[in-house]
């Protein structure tokens, strides 16, 4: 069939898209007790690794632009999880730092990866994650 390559099940993008949507659904009840959305959880993960990052650095880590991040960070600041401040050395840069509440949330969040593994019983999950990370790096070079 000449249009076989246009079938949905032949596309790389669709299983990635579907898996991403479904994985966010699995995370939702795990994050609910923390009051976090999946996107907010990703921001917290980056800040727990290293606090005091710029919006640009956060965007680079999460593959998001500042137009997407800024409203998300404003909501998180309003919730008391982080603070946004201008870099004293460069007023154009906005720095993001965790509040005490944001820091303390990490203790509760430590349970989430194990809870996820119990819900998503995938063999060779590390191999799958590494393959996806390889794909992200390949795609990032092409953008």
Task: Name what the model sees in each region.
Residues 24, 74-133:
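Charged, amphipathic alpha-helical coiled-coil/dimerization segments
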Residues 43-44:
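Short alpha-helical "packing" element that flanks the helix-turn-helix/winged-helix DNA-binding module
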Residues 1-34, 139:
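N-terminal leader segment of winged-helix/HTH proteins
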Residues 34-39, 68, 99, 125:
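Short helix-coil-helix linker/hinge
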Residues 55-56, 67, 74, 94:
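Residues within helix-turn-helix
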Residues 50-54:
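Short capping segments at the starts of secondary-structure elements
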Residues 1-5, 111, 126-143:
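C-terminal regulatory/oligomerization modules of transcriptional regulators
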Residues 59:
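The alpha-helix within a helix-turn-helix
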């Amino acid at each position: 069939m000449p249009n076989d390559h246009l079938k949905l099940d032949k596309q790389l993008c669709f299983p990635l898209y579907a898996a991403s949507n479904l994985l966010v659904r699995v995370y939702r009840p795990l994050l609910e007790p923390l009051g976090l959305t999946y996107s907010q959880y990703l921001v917290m993960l980056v800040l727990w690794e290293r606090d005091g990052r710029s919006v640009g650095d956060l965007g680079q880590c999460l593959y998001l632009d500042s137009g997407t991040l800024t409203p998300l960070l404003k909501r998180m600041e309003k919730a008391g999880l982080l603070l946004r401040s201008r870099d004293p050395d460069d007023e154009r840069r906005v720095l993001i730092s965790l509040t005490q509440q944001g820091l303390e949330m990490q203790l509760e969040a430590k349970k989430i990866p194990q809870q996820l593994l119990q819900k998503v019983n995938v063999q060779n999950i590390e191999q799958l994650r590494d393959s996806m990370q390889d794909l992200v790096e390949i795609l990032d070079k092409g953008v």
